[in-house]
């Protein structure tokens, strides 16, 4: 009986880990991400290199400069999607290497921590109310970002889900 419980728990653990991994990522193919967004009612567009003089790579370099990141490779495609009401959005950078995607993810984590720290500091100083503080934290919870292979994504949870 104990052996069966252990096996059952192991299967449940594997299934839950796989579900998390498979649901938390964006497609590795930019065309599929754009198609999925459109199928879910989003206005979606892809910026590729060659469209506007290597536009995807140029936009990624601008974003990297804002985060003080040095790119080691190039960005091949950027997919953006916005819901019809404008409340949900996602941007996905498809790099030629995972190192650049991870660098963007690390920078976003650091920025989120800074934003939360500053928000708490403003609340503690009495510059914002407790209700405004809680509301801002709730809004931050709706933002999702991460790495999926060589892609870095950020946006609202609903928009990231619409990519899949």
Regions picked out by a protein language model, each given a short descriptive name:
Residues 30, 34, 101-105, 109:
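Extracytoplasmic/secreted envelope proteins and their assembly/folding machinery
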Residues 1-33:
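Gram-positive cell-envelope targeting signals
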Residues 74-85, 139-149:
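Short, surface-exposed beta-strand/loop micro-motifs that present aromatic residues
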Residues 56-70, 110-136:
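Mixed-charge, low-complexity intrinsically disordered segments
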Residues 25-76, 160-164:
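N-terminal "mature-domain start" segment
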Residues 80-104:
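A short acidic-to-branched-hydrophobic micro-motif
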Residues 107-111, 163-164:
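Short amphipathic alpha-helices in soluble, non-transmembrane regions
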Residues 120-164:
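A short, solvent-exposed beta-edge/loop patch
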């Amino acid at each position: 009986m104990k052996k069966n419980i252990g096996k059952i728990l192991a299967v449940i653990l594997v299934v839950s880990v796989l579900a998390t991994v498979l649901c938390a990522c964006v497609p590795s193919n930019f065309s599929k991400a754009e198609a999925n967004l459109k199928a879910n009612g989003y206005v979606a567009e892809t910026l590729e290199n060659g469209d506007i003089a290597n536009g995807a790579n140029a936009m990624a370099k601008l974003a990297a400069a804002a985060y003080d990141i040095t790119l080691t490779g190039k960005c091949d495609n950027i997919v953006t999607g916005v819901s019809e009401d404008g409340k949900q959005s996602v941007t996905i950078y498809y790099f030629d290497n995972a190192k650049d995607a991870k660098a963007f993810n690390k920078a976003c984590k650091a920025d989120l921590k800074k934003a939360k720290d500053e928000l708490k500091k403003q609340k503690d100083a009495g510059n914002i109310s407790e209700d405004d503080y809680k509301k801002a934290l709730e809004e931050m919870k709706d933002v999702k970002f991460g790495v999926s292979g060589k892609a870095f994504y950020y946006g609202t949870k609903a928009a990231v889900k619409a990519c899949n």
